[in-house]
Amino acid sequence: MKKRSVWGRCLAVLMTAVTLVLPGVQAGAKQSTGTRTLMMDTRSYQMAPGNLYDIKVSVNGANVSSSDAVVYSSRDSVARVSRIAGTDKYRVTALREGTTYVTSEVYGVHASVRITVKKGVQKRGEANRSVTVIGTATSQSEMRAVWIPYMSLDMSGQPDRSEAAFRRKFDTLVSQAKNSGMNTLIVHVRPFGDSLYPSAYYPWSHLLTGTQGTSPGYDPLAYMVQATHQAGLKFHAWVNPLRVSLKGLPKSFSSDNPAVIWKNDASKQNWTMEWNGEWYYNPGITEVRDRIVSGVREIVQNYDVDGVQFDDYFYPTTASAIDSVSYLASGTSLSVADWRRQNINALVSEVYAAVKQTKPAVLFGISPQANLQNNRNMGADVATWGSQAGYVDYLCPQLYVNSSNAVMPFDATAVTWRKLVTNPGVKLYFGLALYKADSNADGGTWITPGSVMAYQIQKSRSLGANGFMLYSAAFLENRQTGSEMAQVKKLLHM
C-alpha cells in the first residue's frame, strides 16, 4: 500500500480482515470452496467539499475480478462515488458537509470507510483500498429459484383434468427446474382469492376444474410439496393476498367466495375494492386481514412448505374512491397514502408473526416491484420491511430491466435495493426477467448473444445479494431463451 502524504486529521486507523466460512467449509480451504476473505484499510477521513480522492479495489480469487466489486456511498448527497473508466479505481467527490460511509462489496463480503466532509479540511491525495476475495457462491448458500405462476398449473382448458394429468404437468416443471440448476420453486397456490388445496377460508381455484369452488377430488398442494422435496428442492407457497380477479379471470365466482358473500352484505360491501373491472380485498378492514392471515397460517400448519411469498399486488391505484368509506370510518388523521401503507404494514407484520408462531423455520418473503415510487403508491413500505425486524425474512424486488433501460438501468437499481435492505436479518434476492431474454422486449435491447441473465446473476452476487429468482418456469427450456439458459447453467456449474 502506498505511503500517504499529510492527510489532515485522521479519526481512526484500523486494518480489517473478514473471513466468511460457509456451512461445511473449513477456513483456509482452496479457492474452489466457499471461503471468502476480504482485507481493507478502513481508515476514517475528513475532506473538504469539492475535494477528490481515489479508492483502488483489487480483487483476486476463483471466478472473480475487479469488475465484480461494487463501491458506493451511503449518502450520495454528502459524497458521490464513481468508477474511473478503464481502471480498478473509484473516485470519491465530496459535495457538502456531513458524514457518509463508502462501502466496497464483493460476493457478500464488505468493508466500509467513514468519510466526514467538513469545510476547511486539507485536500487529500490518493487512498488505496485492497480487497481480496476467495471463492464464489455455492448451490447450498445461494437462492436459485424459479417462479411457477398459475398459468403453468392451469388445467381448466385441458381435456384431461385428472390428478394423473396434473401430476405429470407438475413433474415436468420440477424436472426442468432441477436440470436448470434451481434449488427452490415459488409456486402459485392462491392467485385469485382462491386455493389449490382444500381450504377452510377460500374456494377451490377454477384452474383445476374450470369452475371456482369445485373440488378436483385430490390435493394438488400436497402432491406439489411432496414432489418438490423428493427432487431435493425447496417449496415456497406463492400467495396473492388481495387480488380476487384479474383481466376477466376467473370468469365466475363460487357462492362461498368471501368476496361474493361480503359484497352481498350491505354492511360489508366496503370490505372489497373494485378498480378497472378488477376485484381486491380491502386490507383496511381488520376482519379482511384476519382472513388473509388465517389462510397463510393454514398453509404453514397443514403443509411442509419451506416458505410463503407475497408478490407485488397490493393497492391497485392511488385513487381514493376505492376505499373512501373505510378510510373515513377509521377516523385516522393520516393521509390516504400513509393510512394505506399502515394497513399493508399491519398485514405483513401479522402474517410474519403467524408464520413464525406456527413454524419458526418457515420463511416469509415479499417480491415487490423494483420501482420504489410504484411501491409507495401501492402501499408497499419496502424501506420499512428491509430495515426493521418483524416483517419479512427476505425481499426479492422484480428487477425486470436490463442495463440499457433508460429509466431504471439494472445496475443502478440493484445498488439502490442493496442500500435499502439494511437489516442483517432480511435477505435480498433479485427477481430476473428470464421471459424477456433474447426477445424484442424493451425496444429489442434484450436481443443479445445469451449473456444478460448470467451477467445479472454475477452482478447480484457482487452486490452481496443472497440469490435470485427467475420468471418464469415456462422459459427454463424454451427455444427463445436457450442460449441464455446455457450460460446460466455454465455459471451455476451445471
Q: What label would you give each PLM region?
A:
Residues 26-129:
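Extracytoplasmic soluble-region selector
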Residues 136-167, 237, 242-298:
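Active-site-adjacent "subsite" loops/lids of carbohydrate-active enzymes
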Residues 152-164, 202-217, 275-290, 333-343, ...:
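The substrate-binding groove and active-site-proximal loops of carbohydrate-active enzymes
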Residues 161-180, 207-231, 342-347:
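Aromatic- and glycine-enriched glycan-recognition loops and surfaces
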Residues 166, 259, 263-388, 400-401:
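Polysaccharide-binding and catalytic clefts of secreted carbohydrate-active enzymes
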Residues 168-194, 303-305, 463-467:
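Catalytic domains of carbohydrate-active enzymes, especially glycoside hydrolases
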Residues 180-216:
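Aromatic-lined carbohydrate-binding/catalytic grooves of carbohydrate-active enzymes
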Residues 391-409, 417, 424-494:
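Substrate-binding cleft of secreted/luminal carbohydrate-active enzymes
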